[in-house]
Amino acid sequence: MTLAPADLPVSLQPLVDRALARLAQVLTEPIPADLLPLLTRLAVASDFALDTLVRQPALLAQLAAPGCPPIPAPVLDPLQPSDWPAQLRRWRAAMSTRLIWRDLAGLDDVAQTLAGATTLAEDCLRLALEALQQEFAQRHGVIADDQGTPQQLVVFGLGKLGGGELNFSSDIDLVYAYPHGGESDGPRALAAEEYFARLGQRLAKLLDETTVDGFSHRVDLRLRPFGSAGRVALSFAAMDQYFQREGRDWERYAWLKARAVAGDIAAGEAWLQTLRPFVYRRYLDFTALDGLREMKAAITAEVARRELHEDIKRGAGGIREIEFLCQALQLIRGGREPALRERRLLVALDALVAAGQIAPEDGSALREAYLFLRRLENRLQMLRDAQTHVLPSDALDRERIAVGLGYADWNVLRAALAEQQQRVSTEFAALLAPRKGQAAPDALANYWRSLPEGSNAPLLAEAGFLDANGADQSLRDFAQGTGVKSLSDAARARLDRVLPALLHAATRSPQPDAALKRVLGLLQAVLRRTSYLALLDEQPSALARLVDVLARSALLAERLAAYPLLLDELLDVRVSGPMPDAAGMLAECQQVLAVEDPESALRWLNETRLALSFRMAMATLDGRQGAVDSTRQLAELAQAVVVTVLAMAEADMHAAHGGIPGGRFAIIGYGSLGGLELGFGSDLDLVFLHDNPAGVDASDGARPLEPGRWYARLAQKVMALLGAVTAAGRLYDIDVRLRPDGGKGSLVSSLASYTEYQRERAWTWEHQALVRARGVAGDASLLADFEQVRAQTLGRERDTGVLYADVLKMRGRMRTELDRSDAARLDLKQGAGGVVDLEFLLQTGVLARSAQHAALLQPRDTPSLIDALAVAGFLPDATAQALHGAHATLLDVGLACTLDRRPRLAPTTPAIEEACAAITAACRAAELPFA
């Protein structure tokens, strides 16, 4: 807006004339003509700014300087404490006027004005605290910790101060703390509690007290533990105890934005990290909505009681609703998604959009509304430096606000405000509304509430349960179990809403009885975790999705019951989106390497693996991808985990024993891991290699180990980490029997001994296994050396007669010992024409032809091996196409069996018969009559 004196509404002209006349009286020079437009806008927008210029005439030249630079901060003389209040207040008034000037001149947008107000408050806090600390040190001494380091007060800023988005005339929410107890060492010694409490009270008074120069900042200390009844300053230990025992839901919202703003900032930020589990729960936490409902109800009651309907902060569609909406979504998901742990609202809003929790168009609307409301809020407060959020009732004030913001009149501004408030109200109501969509009590709900005394098998039969008596008994047993009986009233109310809805969903599933059994198993597991009951209560769509998954997959039902954190995945928008690629999965896994606590890091890695494999299972179950893709992804995930675990183990070894200078270590994946065809729950076939440089006989740490022991210890650590049981389960079972000499051989083979073994002593079946082997983790140069050894081993000339005889003998032995097929069912893996027949065919082709066709040495996975053998002429093109289809069919059926916890013994169907026939025909054509 460009408002020149000639553009003023007639009604505002007298006000501006009086303002400019007042200013002219105190200036030694006439008002420069080029400043008149901006001073006109200032006169319309702010009595406070004009009053400040009248009191500090020299300020005008500073504001008019190019770029409107900051006003130098005052120096608070320790010898003149009586001057401090005036110095702080005059500087704050000057800097606040500068904020108004920059806003009106278009130098700052809304976000910059909020940041400027925050910085000003922090600077005033810092100046005041530093001066008071010197005074206290002279009078009372200092309080040192056990190492003799002086302690400082820690000042936490909450609310908008913590978020860096302070409005123009806001109070500042402060909480005082200190690291440790103790006593000061001065002539008038004080205990730490008294020392820091007095210091904090003096700080608040120095900033807050109104004098002839006004005030610096209004200080609110009521957000401290126990509120106004609590101690003014608490030790970190006392703060910890409070939040462990007394912390309430609304305090999670308050401390979400907390930031150390003065004093010992480093200590404060370190302590805030310890508070993070209180603010952000480890799992999706829909109980946060309960706290939000309580706070919103209290605010609504206050608005009604105090007739604050014109309040743009607390009223409907106001600033507070945007803040609550973002903070609630942050609290729900921030424990799982670090990107959401953000103090700044606009940054948090962007993160919520990026995480899929707010639609992009809704995020844009909320951003626009927030900036609109904050700009209006600032202008209301700039008028007279008043902490107000209420629209003015005075006609002249209304016109000043509207014209100052660039609107033709108040009605136009009011209409724009109403539009923004409606947007906010709609979004906020949607957040709190989901449970209202659940059906009113019906027959199934009344039946559940009658248990365990009641019984109504006919009702369950009518609802669709085949074994109605069994379902009735299961529900009665569940209702009278200690888990249900020990629920709090609030949790029981949630269960009473959730369980009937689950029953309805079960009756609509293809297998109602199985769904009910699995639902009750899951509920039994989560009864003590009210956050999961809250999730199902607040999110009916998740409830329906849950029952659908439980009905179709016994494996996922077991995993959900064992690890309820997977319920989070049902609400994750990514569960229906594309899977991350191998690099993306590695990046997700390696986030744990930044966690200092090894136990927490391992648990997080387990949770990451669980979540990613769950998403793969869901994609497979829903038919969004075939088993070939899923098994490849599972192998890539396993490799990412192994790489991460190796890094953890190496860090542990280096910390304890140092490293082997110039030494190399690598992990080779065999079997399904090497062949990129891993199943759900498959173990990992691993072989460990090392290469130790000549002349190095020990590690270089404080507790050195000779190289052989060092590498063995490293491999053992890798295996221990992969197999360790955590709250999120274990990563993988490990099989190391494919190493040279099997169980009798060394756990870690040197590259030289491995090379010699493959050249001189390995059996044919071991060379078959080598076809799918590939390096998965460790030193890149050693992995390259392994590839060379593998190529030399597989690519040598062979006696095909001996090769075929060995392969047929081994396959016959396996068929006899492992095939579980019967007259009606086929063992998908070991049966005639099954997966192993196909693997043996391909492995034989590689061993027989790679001496002449080096390209056969590159692929490891079945589809690529089929293609390569077709190019090499080992398989006709038509046969290769048939084998691709057969492989996909058997893998799809096998993975479906795994997902439903059925053995991979499948009733023969036309598709399975066709697949087996194709594999059997290909084997016979290659002179490998396995069947």
Curated annotation (Swiss-Prot):
CC terms in the record's Gene Ontology section: cytosol
Superkingdom of origin: Bacteria
The keyword ATP-binding is assigned to this record: yes
Keyword Metal-binding tagged: no
Region of interest (Adenylyl removase), residue spans: 1-434
Annotated segments matching region Adenylyl transferase: 441-931
One GO term of the biological process aspect: regulation of glutamine family amino acid metabolic process
Cofactors, names only: Mg(2+)
InterPro entries: GlnE (IPR023057), GlnE_rpt_dom (IPR005190), NT_sf (IPR043519), PII_UdlTrfase/GS_AdlTrfase (IPR013546)
A GO MF label: [glutamate-ammonia-ligase] adenylyltransferase activity
Listed PANTHER family: BIFUNCTIONAL GLUTAMINE SYNTHETASE ADENYLYLTRANSFERASE_ADENYLYL-REMOVING ENZYME (PTHR30621:SF0), GLUTAMINE SYNTHETASE ADENYLYLTRANSFERASE (PTHR30621)
Similarity field: Belongs to the GlnE family.
Name of the protein in its database record: Bifunctional glutamine synthetase adenylyltransferase/adenylyl-removing enzyme
Organism: Stenotrophomonas maltophilia (strain K279a)
Lineage: Bacteria, Pseudomonadati, Pseudomonadota, Gammaproteobacteria, Lysobacterales
